[in-house]
Regions:
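Outer membrane beta-barrel strand-and-loop segments of large Gram-negative receptors
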Residues: 413, 422-426, 466-473, 478, ...
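Short, acidic Ser/Thr/Gly-rich low-complexity loop/linker segments typical of extracellular
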Residues: 55-71
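Short, acidic, small-residue-rich periplasmic hinge/interaction motif at the N-terminus
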Residues: 24, 37, 49-53, 87-89, ...
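Short acidic/polar hinge/loop motifs at secondary-structure boundaries
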Residues: 75, 189-214
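N-terminal periplasmic accessory domains that precede
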Residues: 111-113, 155-158, 174, 197-198, ...
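Transmembrane beta-barrel wall of Gram-negative outer-membrane proteins
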Residues: 254-281, 295-340, 365-367
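Surface-exposed extracellular loop regions of Gram-negative outer-membrane beta-barrel proteins
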Residues: 232-245, 285-288, 308-313, 322-325, 394-396, 507-508, 537-583, 603-626, ...
Length: 816
């Protein structure tokens, strides 16, 4: 507690000069304010255009956009009669007449309700779909389910269709703007499940939306160079009993099934809600790697049979209009079995051929318990909120390895048990000091503990070259983070700004077999700043800055072997230190007739970069070890362009282009010989520098054929991508889809044919640690059939809760 008290006191000293900037607006001119909400859900409508026109409606006088909470305020209006309008894609335009005069210069319009736009087609009323991608001030929001391209078996299946996001189908690693240092959240909370596994376990039908926050403010935790990806799950709060049922079947080589049920009951002061989703199926994966100089090939065949179940139960208790208590729990259960075969063939010397078989049996359970209390004061937007989140994760993995041929290792089994605990407590205070100023203060405590137990029945070589029993390892990794933040912002007629600072005190310790292997303590300051210029309701320019950190993730510091093949093993490095990034962005949004265009540029300055290190195994010089290390400072930059446009009423287009460039540095070792029996004298160490520029292009077209039938076509192209390990060849695919609505729009049937030309595969070539080339294939060519049905009705008064980012940098790399 003394950590938080000290940090909070320091923040008050730093922010008091900014609080004095708050001032009252000019009362000689008119002011109008209010809040815009959705008619069906009663949720705030963020970033809707608010327009003030002349009395005859022919001239635009001024305007603005609503905040994320749906609030708006227009100032400095002269006396007179005006037309007030609120516009947003997918809604009817709201319009009313206003009179500004002496004694009536401060108008509170209260709640402005927007109704969904409807069209009459052949006598049947059809509700218009809202834009799939919403461009907000600090984030992009992708509405899953509004678009056939976001239909699939799991979160991992839909991520590649999202602008600036890429998922490696082989390893499950996710990247944002070409960088894997991205934080992934579920409902704004950390999950103890490793990200690659988490994306495969969440059924796509359980997801409401996905948010991309590329330059978060000081209110958010600073982890993640490239930003935050927040997966928002469904939660109902409609009056009465309501629900949604979804199910889908994907068929490639094997079949995969997912389904979800989303229910709620609200009456009076209570809202009870729950969600169940599952993802059950079999996956096939294969590939090969050719070592050019020694003329050998590794061939891989993998098969997985996985089952995951996700449960969410919660209750909101509205004590009165000022006090709300909420509780929810997420339970995630996973059971996976896999087997694989690795064949190493030496074409010039078949006597060295090796075949390794393995069987993997793993299961895990993640439990999350969350409590929240919110107190609203009399002033609109003035509140304090306390949240406590406790997360448990248990995992057991048993792997059985057997080899035939020239292998010198007897058959063996590996056993890995993992236990993780995280407790987070937040206290947040928000105060609109006046009509143009807003102050936010907060404290946070995060406590992590991870225990990994490893044992094996196998043998390994010691330093003398003798086979000895593989020692057991117990690795304990603890991290405590205490932080405080403050943000202050003001909004004027055309200009707005926000400044913030976050202070963190971090303590890290790691023990291997009860011996202290590593400790680290540091206190850092993370400033942020945003300046926004809105000359009119159609244009917006924003410049932002934030300082970020990438703390080494568990797999990057864990000395226990992550995976192994006959020629490759991967380990963590307990001596890694954090990587720091200064991130700069400029974004411009232009609203045009029937759509909008958003463009942006970003630049990152990176210190103590964490990247791959590739070593020759000293106990077997024909094998390679993958690990991580810190390297020299570097930088990265990129550009993004996205648009949504409706050229005619039955055709809408969503497109995006992103380009990023970064200089990467790493360490590699190679063998300077072709002798099949090399010595340590043949090892050559080299510091590698790679200049990489890569780009992605996505284009989605949606066609309204009839009142009930919609067709879609989606195309994706990823350019060549370089890294320390290899250069990845270009990749591309085309998906086609159709959707049919029934039961007066309450039900939908969806059909997707993905990767119709079967072109999506990962192919590469590289020089480290050996000259090699290869490719990997998965079930990208598949058919998806889905159905959803909603029932019940009622108005929504959803509990508004903050969304937070949490995570640490994950391991990664794959088996190349």
């Amino acid at each position: 507690m003394r950590h938080l008290s000290f940090l909070f006191a320091l923040l008050l000293c730093m922010t008091s000069p900014f609080i004095s900037l708050a001032n009252d607006p000019d009362t000689a001119l008119g002011i109008i304010n209010g809040k815009v909400v959705d008619d069906a859900s009663n949720q705030p409508v963020a970033y809707a255009a608010v327009v003030i026109k002349s009395e005859d409606g022919t001239k635009t006088i001024t305007g603005g956009i609503t905040t994320e909470d749906g609030n708006f305020e227009i100032k400095k209006l002269p006396d007179g009669t005006f037309i007030f309008e609120v516009q947003f894609i997918g809604y009817k335009t709201y319009s009313q007449k206003l009179i500004i005069a002496k004694g009536k210069r401060n108008l509170n319009l209260g709640t402005v309700i927007l109704e969904e736009e409807t069209k009459e087609l052949e006598g049947v009323e059809v509700v218009a779909e809202r834009t799939t991608i919403e461009q907000r001030v600090d984030r992009k929001v992708i509405n899953v389910g509004k678009d056939l391209t976001t239909a699939g078996a799991s979160a991992a299946d839909i991520m590649n269709n999202i602008p600036s996001v890429n998922v490696d189908a082989q390893t499950g690693d996710i990247s944002l703007r070409g960088n894997s240092n991205v934080r992934v959240m579920v409902d704004g909370k950390l999950s103890n499940v490793p990200v690659a596994q988490l994306l495969k376990q969440i059924p796509s039908t359980s997801i409401k939306s996905i948010e991309l926050i590329t330059n978060p403010s000081a209110k958010y935790n600073p982890e993640g160079m490239s930003g935050i990806i927040n997966i928002v799950l469904h939660k109902n709060a409609n009056i009465g009993f309501n629900g949604n049922i979804n199910m889908g079947l994907t068929k490639g080589i094997e079949a995969k099934f997912n389904s979800s049920v989303d229910l709620n009951y609200r009456n009076g002061k209570f809202n009870f809600y729950g969600n169940y989703g599952n993802n059950i199926g079999k996956w096939v994966n294969d590939g090969s790697i050719l070592r050019v100089e020694e003329n050998s090939r590794q061939k891989f065949d993998f098969f997985n049979n996985n089952k995951s179940h996700l449960y969410k139960l919660g209750v909101d208790f509205y004590l009165n209009d000022k006090n709300t208590i909420s509780f929810f729990t997420n339970q995630n259960i996973y059971d996976g079995k896999g087997d694989g075969k690795t064949q190493v063939t030496y074409f010039n010397n078949p006597s060295r051929n090796v075949t390794q078989l393995f069987f993997d049996d793993s299961n895990n359970r993640s439990e999350q318990y969350n409590f929240d209390y919110k107190l609203d004061f009399n002033k609109e937007g003035h509140n304090i909120e306390l949240e406590v989140d406790h997360n448990l994760f248990e995992s057991e993995q048993d792997a059985d390895f057997s080899s035939t041929g020239a292998s010198t290792f007897p058959n063996y089994m590996d056993f890995v048990d993992t236990d993780r605990t995280q407790t987070t407590a937040n206290l947040d205070y928000v105060n609109p000091l006046d009509s143009i100023s807003k102050l936010e203060l907060g404290l946070q405590s995060r406590n992590f503990e991870t225990k990994v137990d490893y044992s094996s029945t196998g043998q390994s070589f010691n330093s003398n070259g003798d086979l000895v029993p593989t020692p057991s390892t117990k690795f304990v990794y603890d991290m405590d983070i205490y932080s405080a933040y403050a943000t202050f912002g003001q909004s004027y007629e055309k200009w707005s700004y926000q400044m913030g600072v976050r202070i963190e005190d971090v303590q890290v310790k790691a023990d291997t077999n009860a011996v202290r292997a590593f400790t680290d303590k540091y206190t850092e300051i993370y400033p942020s700043g945003f300046v926004t210029y809105k000359p009119n309701e159609k244009d917006q320019l924003q410049i932002s800055y934030s300082r970020r950190v990438d703390r080494p993730g568990l797999q990057q510091v864990n000395p226990i072997r992550e995976f192994a093949t006959p020629l490759l093993s991967a380990f963590g490095n307990p001596n890694l230190v954090p990587q720091f990034t200064s991130s700069y962005e400029v974004n411009y949004t232009k609203r045009i007739k029937n759509g909008s265009v958003t463009g942006g540029v970003f630049y990152r300055s990176i210190t103590d970069e964490i990247n791959r290190a590739i070593y020759i195994d000293r106990l077997d010089l024909n094998k390679t070890i993958l690990t991580f290390d810190n390297f020299d400072n570097t930088s990265a930059y990129g550009v993004e362009l996205s648009t949504n446009y409706k050229p005619i009423k039955w055709w809408s287009i969503n497109g995006s282009f992103d380009l990023f460039s970064q200089t990467q540095r790493g360490l590699t070792e190679t063998l300077n010989t072709t002798d099949p029996n090399p010595t340590e004298d043949d090892i050559v160490e080299e510091k590698v520098k790679v200049d990489n520029t890569a780009w992605n292009l996505r284009m989605n077209n949606s066609f309204t054929v009839t009142k009930k039938l919609t067709l879609q076509a989606f195309g994706f192209y990823r350019g060549r991508n370089k890294s320390i390990q290899f250069d990845a060849n270009p990749m591309y695919f085309v998906n086609l889809g159709a959707r049919y609505s029934f039961a007066e729009g309450k039900g939908t049937l969806s059909f997707n044919y993905n990767d119709i030309f079967n072109t999506m595969r990962f192919a590469f070539e590289g020089s480290y640690p050996y000259a090699q080339e290869g490719s990997f294939n998965w079930e990208s060519n598949n058919v998806y059939v889905g159905m959803s049905y909603r029932f019940g009705s009622g108005k929504n008064r959803a509990k508004s809760r903050k969304r937070r980012d949490n995570n640490t940098k994950q391991g990664g790399g794959g088996i190349l």
